């Protein structure tokens, strides 16, 4: 669920935007070093996938909605840094064109949806994979 404008104070929104700035910078640098040029378009596909998933809202009690993001899936396929950039771009387009979330709360939404979600899912998967509890692990 996107955080709407005027839900958080402007100082909180500004703090989270400033917190996201080095994360975006480091993510772009990491992508340039680790992903080959032929995989860069996959980031756009991942962003489009996240964009589509976030457009399907499901009503939940108390008059709000929830939606899938696909951040962990993108992180598992392309890495958490690529997922961070892909989801941030999708959130920006949604904030500008559709008004989902908001311009002021863009940094807060990116922090929650584009940073915490893919990195947490990615590292939980890695930990479960190491101790052989991954749903994708099977003995040969």
What is the meaning of each model-derived region?
Residues 46, 82-84, 121:
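Structural motif
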Residues 113-140:
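Short helix-perturbing small/polar motifs within transmembrane alpha-helices
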Residues 54-117:
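Alpha-helical membrane segments and adjacent membrane-interface helices in multi-pass membrane proteins
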Residues 28-32, 58, 94, 98, ...:
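Membrane-water interface at transmembrane helix exits
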Residues 6-10, 14, 31-40, 80, ...:
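Hydrophobic, aromatic-rich alpha-helical transmembrane segments
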Residues 18-23, 86, 116, 120-121, ...:
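Alpha-helical transmembrane segments and their lipid-water interface positions
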Residues 2-15, 20-73:
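Hydrophobic transmembrane alpha-helices
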């Amino acid at each position: 669920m996107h955080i709407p404008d005027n839900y958080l104070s402007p100082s909180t929104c500004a703090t989270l935007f400033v917190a996201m700035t080095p994360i975006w910078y480091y993510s772009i640098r990491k992508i340039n070093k680790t992903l080959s040029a032929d995989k860069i378009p996959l980031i756009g596909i991942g962003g489009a996938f996240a964009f589509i998933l976030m457009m399907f809202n499901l009503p939940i009690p108390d008059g709000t909605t929830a939606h899938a993001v696909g951040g962990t899936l993108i992180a598992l396929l392309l890495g958490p840094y690529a997922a961070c950039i892909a989801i941030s771009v999708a959130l920006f387009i949604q904030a500008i064109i559709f008004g989902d979330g908001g311009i002021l709360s863009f940094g807060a939404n990116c922090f929650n949806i584009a940073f915490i979600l893919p990195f947490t899912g990615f590292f939980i998967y890695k930990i479960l994979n190491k101790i052989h509890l991954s749903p994708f692990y099977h003995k040969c």
